[in-house]
Amino acid sequence: MMIAENAPFWRRKTLEQLSPQEWEALCDGCGLCCLQKLEDEDDNSVYYTRIACKLLDLDSCQCSDYPNRFAQVPDCIQLTPGKADQFKWLPSTCGYRLVSEGKDLPAWHHLVCGDRQQVHEQRISQSGRMLREQDVHEDDWEDHLIFRAS
């Protein structure tokens, strides 16, 4: 299928073709990838908790030290186009996952509607509903599961 040249970049480019600016813009700012996750040892399912990384702002869902996040949080996961086949653990609403699956961005995505607050207003993010990592003992994370990655 031929896609018009004036189509949005995420519809006419693969993830590997995106510029660094386009790649960053694809992030909807939901912060879900920065929530602590647990993996079921029996079936390898990934479960999201409402426990946020220590660097995640609980209201804006933005990293408080994005440029230095890998030094501050050694197990912080860097999303890159080359890892698109591993994006299944990302939420089904994630722009990176959607584009990697050949799907369009939802109407609430800031690149579609022009409003970065829609991700929060539509309750896609966990803004205002997360717990700080330092406030919950790791043994208690199971008590705070919110959904299973599909």
UniProtKB/Swiss-Prot annotation:
What cystine pairs are annotated?
none
According to the lineage, what is the superkingdom? Bacteria
Q: One Pfam family name from the record?
A: CxxCxxCC
Among HAMAP family, the record links this protein to: UPF0260
Q: Which family does it belong to?
A: Belongs to the UPF0260 family.
**Protein name, please?**
UPF0260 protein PputGB1_4117
